[in-house]
Amino acid sequence: MKPQFLVHDKKDDVGVAVVDITAGEKAAGSCLEDGSKVTIEAKDSIPLGHKIALKAFKKDENVTKYGVIIGHATQAITAGAHVHVHNVKSNRW
C-alpha cells in the first residue's frame, strides 16, 4: 500500500499528507529516513500537504518536522489531529 503521509526524519512528531486523509480512517505512513512504517487513526480530515500529529502535544510543546523544531503547539493537540496554523505557531516570529 502506498503511504498516505510521509515522515521526513525519525525525530519528527508530525507527518505530511501526500493524499487527502479522511477523519476516522487508519492512515498509513512511511519514514523517508529509514523506511519504517507507522499507522495512526486520523482524528480530523487532513488535506494534502498538511501535517498529521503522530503523538499528543501539550500547549506550548515543541513540534518537530525535518528533524528540527518548527514551532510550538498553541493548544493541546491529540494524536491523529490536523496540525496547521490554527494550532501551531512558528518559534521564528
Which positions does each model-derived feature cover?
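N-terminal small-residue-enriched
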Residues: 2-93
